[in-house]
Amino acid sequence: MTQSTIPNPRLDESRTIIAPTGTQLNAKSWLTEAPLRMLMNNLHPDVAEHPHALVVYGGIGRAARNWECYDKIVEVLKRLEDDETLIVQSGKPVGVFKTHTNAPRVLIANSNLVPHWANWEHFNELDKEGLMMYGQMTAGSWIYIGSQGIVQGTYETFVAMARQHFNGDAKGRWVLTGGLGGMGGAQPLAATMAGFSMLAVECDESRIDYRLRTGYVDSKATTLDEALAIIEESKQTGKPVSVGLLGNAADVYADIVKRGIVPDVTTDQTSAHDPLNGYLPQGWSMEHAAAMRLEDEAIVVKAAKQSMAVQVQAMLALQEAGSATVDYGNNIRQMALEEGVENAFDFPGFVPAYIRPLFCEGIGPFRWVALSGDPEDIYKTDQKVKELIPDNPHLHNWLDMARERIQFQGLPARICWVGLKDRARLGKAFNEMVKNGELKAPIVIGRDHLDSGSVASPNRETEGMMDGSDAVSDWPLLNALLNTASGATWVSLHHGGGVGMGFSQHSGMVIVCDGTDDAAERVGRVLRNDPATGVMRHADAGYDIAINCAEEQGLDLPMVNTKNTHSK
């Protein structure tokens, strides 16, 4: 059999994966049914970008290493006992061990490489040999919920931009961005929710069409003139609108600079973190890029990075012209720097610019999913959040907008940014709702790995830490260990998510609210300790907001003086 006729173990066009719903179990308990349903939900055709290839989002972020591994994971989860733990190594189920009932049912490690070898070249070699997979953040940890998972974080960022740059009023303002994939696809909806109009450049027309169908983008344009006309009309009417422009981001950004047009805000969410699979070089078609990836990877990577350099140079020019310009966490500045753009980091990342004060209080992307499949379960939990946090109109407004404007993808889910003060009591309340029958089936609670204590990423979440500890990756490892000790239902530890190989380490957790008293205890521990690691990490770095939060919430941090001084 020739190389070209060997079946691709990662591609099966015949497979359509839909998670079960309702109360009938396919596994032995809800503690194993939950990871089973969430794994399958990651591959739902309305959730995953390329489900037939096991790709969930973010270039090549997969849910399982290949279809054989997927089938075996499903088989094991169906037979797994409540005192056993499944070990998953880069999407491959490698062992089942006797543990105990409060231990995680699944422990996952994805894409981790010894630092000296932690680069795309070495990873791609292993990936081609079937020895690894790229887990991104929530793809390989089975808690991706579609674009909603990033909408609120993006919304919070745009609200902060409006507050910092435009006196809190985004009316008549517009954002230029690139990328409408799994992460970037959240941008247009988040922008219009925050009052901005948006022009989003995307080279894959199917992505624009999908965002149109799901209500994340309002209109499509095929020329820059057409897109700018839509933006100009929105500026005149004051009504925010989003437009997806079919094109290459590097080309369009450079053209906008050439025309002397200055967006109010400039950013980017193309998959620049992965130059081989995630970014289309200038002048290339999608088909040509796909063929070249098989023929000569080095040429693809070089061409992509050269185009990124062009785009970043345009972003720098727009910043110089007065546009509020920010890196939205895809590592495009690093790629441009490697191509000789020496001032690529002259515009900031979004976390130090807008999000870090939230991280200091353990506030981040808290998300939950209704395993029943019934949207009413989510609406009831929305109401419970409002009852338990009555004095936060900003949060209430978010929940109202989310219900009105966000379509569920796969299993019904919700995200809302809450912190150390609120996560545990919300989780325990959800568990009580399951116990008393208010909800039709259990809820799972998880989060993005982009959270306050679960990631080390010097070009994104930990950029510019005040004590210089940007690259210290002990923190996500400790977060994973503590979540394991606290009784999370599944725990994951990944490398390279968001910004690519060699640039990040991060951890995730998911906890099941099945209505039992044991679950209530686990939920209380996990949903306090998990965000507390974020407060701890930022307090240790010397942030006053975190030190004060630690004192208010009674955290025991032996080396942190809660009188607002940092003890080394």
UniProtKB/Swiss-Prot annotation:
One of its GO terms (cellular component) is cytoplasm. The keyword Chloroplast does not apply. GO terms for molecular function: urocanate hydratase activity. The active site is at residue 416. InterPro entries: Urocanase, Urocanase-like, Urocanase_C, Urocanase_central_sf, Urocanase_CS, Urocanase_N, Urocanase_Rossmann-like, Urocanase_sf. PROSITE patterns: UROCANASE. PANTHER family: UROCANATE HYDRATASE. Pathway: Amino-acid degradation; L-histidine degradation into L-glutamate; N-formimidoyl-L-glutamate from L-histidine: step 2/3. Its cofactor is NAD(+). Keywords: Cytoplasm, Histidine metabolism, Lyase, NAD. It is an enzyme of class 4 (lyase). GO terms for biological process: L-histidine catabolic process to glutamate and formamide; L-histidine catabolic process to glutamate and formate. The keyword Cytoplasm applies. This is Urocanate hydratase. Binds 1 NAD(+) per subunit. It is found in: Cytoplasm. It holds the Pfam family Urocanase_N. It catalyses: 4-imidazolone-5-propanoate = trans-urocanate + H2O. Its EC number is 4.2.1.49. Catalyzes the conversion of urocanate to 4-imidazolone-5-propionate. Belongs to the urocanase family. NAD(+) binds at residues 58-59, 136, 182-184, 202, 207, 248-249, 269-273, 279-280, 328, 498.
